[in-house]
Amino acid sequence: MYTCAVRPEIASLSAYGPGMSIAEVRERYGLSRVIKMASNENPLGVSPLVRKVLATSLEEAFRYPQGGNPALREALARTHHVSPERIVVGNGSDEIIDMLIRMLAVPGRHSVVCFEPCFSLYPIQARICGVETRRCPLSPDYSFDLDALFSLVDAGTRLVFVTTPDNPSGYCPPLAAMRRLAKQLERHFPRCLLVVDEAYMDFAGASCGEAPRFSLLASGDLPANVAILRTFSKSYGLAGLRLGYGVLPAELAGFYWRARLPFSVNSLAEKAGLAVLRDSEFRRATLECIRSGRCRLTEGLRLLGCDVWPSEANFLMIRLPEGYDASSCFEHLLQCGIIIRPLSSYGMPDKLRISIGTKEDNEAFLEVLRSFLEKSF
């Protein structure tokens, strides 16, 4: 008889918990229409150009993709004005996070450093790899104390993870502060890689031209000890195809291609990525939808008495007026066919995260929230 003898790190692991799907909510509550504002997906859906490309690419699905995804790497290199040798792609940026930890950190000897709370995949993958995670609390206003983060780094630290804009607050640290952190790490701990997760960076600022104010990648001067992570899941609308990419030091990128599982990016995902990079109108419409919706939702939520944290991302973190329960609000919204994200798993049981939707979705959410606040008063 077989005895399942998994490693202790796996046996004690809590699985990543995604938000409820539209199908789950429909089935549970018997609803015909459900609005999902929980997972920070693109409210405009799939690019029209991607739809066309995928419709004509299915006949090639029996073929393996080209090894190393050179066409996609070249396109991303042109987009970000970097050498193709620095570009890596993965089955979502999750794969790149996992690979970086496995390539750089030796179990039982090395550590990774991140904020708490943070994207849960950083500590989860570190734990799976048997690597210590050191966590720095966020400041009371959910900004970053980068000096406190740096204080957790020592000679055995191999990766420092920083998400900007941060999830779930939407906070962006000043670019100068990020540069200073990179220089501190390079000077004192040259074997430590600063991993900057810019999954939501496309939405930063009030207009498209403001990205260089916040982004190390967009600034055009990327420090040598920095890896940038990006994704096609958010502004590009390809969350279901699992496609992410990174800009790494060239030598490290070379090792990534040696260690990565072959063909982890499927051919349809690659074709979709190439297509959406060409669809400038879809990108413009997406960013306009998010930026205008972010302003409208912020205004509407504050008029309802909610605390709303300033956000540079495609979501807002809120706290209900005093006396109202976040969990009850979440359940009420579900019953009305609106999915948002409760933040109890982030250690914030009094807060909620709302993804920016279409104009119609945003107004529907505000109306249902208003009814909850009035009913519960």
Residue ranges: model-predicted function:
Residues A176, S328, Q335-C336, R341, ...:
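PLP-dependent enzyme catalytic core of the Aspartate aminotransferase-like
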Residues Y2-D94, M99, S376-F377:
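N-terminal small-domain helix-loop-helix segment of the aminotransferase-like
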Residues M103-Q125:
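Conserved PLP-anchoring active-site segment centered on the Schiff-base-forming lysine
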Residues G68, N225-W309:
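PLP-dependent aminotransferase class I/II
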Residues R33, S83-I87, G108-S111, G156, ...:
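Short acidic capping loops at alpha-helix termini that bridge into adjacent secondary structure
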Residues R127, S143-G156, P168-S233:
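Active-site pre-lysine segment of PLP-dependent enzymes
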Residues P140, R291, L303-C336, L352:
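Conserved PLP-binding catalytic core of the aspartate aminotransferase-like
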